[in-house]
Amino acid sequence: MVGQGLHNTGFPTIRYGLALNLLSIGRLKFESYEVENIRPLVTASPLFSRLLTELGEQKLARVIGATEMITGSLIAARPFAPRASALGSLGAAGIFATTLSFLATTPEAWQEKRREPKLSLAGQFLVKDIVLLGASLLTAAESLQASRRTQSTTR
């Protein structure tokens, strides 16, 4: 019983916390200071540096922000659109896998002059996306299961 109660509380917390995270951070991409904050990450990334050249900093930040906000909205749509929520969760998994790749491409993610690699403040900021990636995969799985249940009851 306690386990089920924790599950019933924990899963919505994961889902809506994930959605809120994406909506909030996505909205910030429309602020000039956030454009400056993501500059070192996108400049060092092979994928994003190309997009940066084509779109410029402001447009790239807005595309990223809009993507994050749409993804967060889809995740939150789970009660009435579980398939859309699953799509949003899978999109979020892609977002967080991409940001985790910045650990490999951003020199500022690691402290220099150490015997073994140690995360810098930027690296610590990025490594939390492992948890968000896991949350995205869990919410995708649950939404897909809910979608199947919905389909089987409507047949």
Describe every region a protein language model picked out.
Residues 1-155:
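Membrane-interface extramembranous regions
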